[in-house]
């Protein structure tokens, strides 16, 4: 089987993001990968799949199940399937999110994006 190329795309939207390997609404058995930027913002969601975040730049606070960890460039964290994750950048964070399999295509429960004071 030949390699599959996913062309580069600009970061767009709120929060700024781009789909590298897009999650499919009908589900996926491999991984989905996205790049995210937060600028003095937080994003909260509950997802049916494992989510691994790798921080490229800045500082990212991740809270799940009552525990909060602080990540810097080069750090990564796993938020397990079924968990609610709060991803908070006090100033700026750019990260790569890898989503584990979601064969049933169950959607995430998105609480949304909000600015930090």
Could you say what each language-model-derived stretch is?
Residues 49-60, 65:
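Glycine- and acidic-residue-biased ligand/ion/polar-headgroup-sensing regions
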Residues 66-82:
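Short acidic-glycine-tyrosine-enriched beta hairpin
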Residues 81-106:
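Ligand-binding loop in jelly-roll beta-barrel domains
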